[in-house]
Amino acid sequence: HHHFDHVGGLRTYLSQGTTIVTHDSNKEYYLDILFHPGPRTLNPDRLAKYNPMYWISRRPAPIETVSGEARGTGKYVITDGVKILEIYHVQDMNYELGDQSLRYGHHSEDMLMAYLPQDGILFNADLYTPTQSSALPKVTISMVTLNENIKKLKLSPVTHAPSHGQPGSHAQFLSIFGD
C-alpha cells in the first residue's frame, strides 16, 4: 500500500538488501520515492550513508511485483520451507463487477494483503481495523471489498491483523455483516 503511513523506512530496508514486494502499478512510484534527489527527514539516511552510489550503479532495485487485473488475482508466495506467506492483490471487487456506485477512490486498486494460511492470520492495510469495543462498526465499502476478496480467494482467516490498531477475530469481522 503506497500511502505515506505505510512506506516509511523503505530506504532503510533497501539499504539492508531487503526485497520490496508491491503491486506492479506501484513500482515506478517506489523507484521515484526511493531515489528522488530531494531532501530527506533523516539526512543522511541509511541508504545515503552506506550505499550512496546505489542508483548510479545500474543495479536494479530489488522490487518484485504482484499483478492483478480486473477479475483476475495476483498471488506472490514467500516461504522459508516451513511457513508460507501468500500475498494477494486486493481487487475492488464490487466496482470491477459493475456496480459503479461502490468505487472507493482507488483505495484498493493497487493494494496487497498478506495471508499466513497455517496460522489463519490475514494482514490488511486500511480495509478493516477491528474495534476493541463491543459496538459493531458500520459496514464500509472497504470492509465489503475485503470480505469479497476473502470469499473469492477461499481464504480461511482466524485473525485479522490490521496495519493500524489491534488484531481481532474473523468471527468479529463476519458479525459486522450479520454472518
Set out the residue ranges of the language-model regions:
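General beta-strand structural signal in soluble alpha/beta enzymes
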Residues: 22-23, 162
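Short active-site oxyanion
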Residues: 14-20, 157-158
